[in-house]
């Protein structure tokens, strides 16, 4: 997936922008350039996730943190997310590091 995102932001969208400019559509070219920036961010996310998978840190941390179940909202504090949610029985894959971005 990361390679696909790389191709999009390095090759495809810049080429689309160039063509749009050449054909007299500067607003569309501008949009393609902005989409290219989004695709670059997607690549970064995929590569970070791959690194976390390879390092075994998707569901573990060196310090105690809060993990939140994305299904029911249950919050667990520990170095590792539970194998199964104690509240709704969903698997560990439903846990993420709790965000307080509200």
Where are these predicted regions, by residue range?
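Non-heme di-metal
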Residues: 1-102
